[in-house]
Amino acid sequence: MDLQHATLGTLLRALLDQLDPAVEQAYRDLKLDYRPRYTPVLRTLMAQGPCRIKDLALACGLSHSALSQTASAMVRDGWLHAAVGEDSRERILQLSPRALQALPALQAQWQATARAARSLDADLGQSLEQVLRDALQALGQRPFAQRLRDTPQR
């Protein structure tokens, strides 16, 4: 892959194109119909118990729309149950029996993924996850749009 002239966005997409298929294949190897994007939802529900979509989106750092789409897929695939909340417009999500049964295999795979990430970190000489967290924090303090406006045009 020749990324000599790639810019930040292209490099970030290329990185995800390297990571996501490998993780998806690991789940297929376990005979699980599971997507990496389900992980933050499952982990949050494991930690907090049943949640409204709004609260889950906030906890996962996703937009309400993105979380709603992911949750719909997870309900369809049998990973979550959705119930109507106190307000008939809100849905309360909780882990399904399928999710609870698969947790040991998923947790083992999450640990393997973390070990693989540490191997990458060792090759890089720094934690990629920490670099990404730091970048997101910096952008939270001063968004990229502001940085673009502050950069002189030549």
Question: Locations of the language-model features?
Answer:
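Charged, amphipathic alpha-helical coiled-coil/dimerization segments
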Residues: 72-130
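Short, locally clustered residues in the helix-turn-helix/winged-helix DNA-binding domain
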Residues: 16, 43-47, 107
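Short, hydrophobic-biased segments on the C-terminal half of alpha helices
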Residues: 53, 71-72
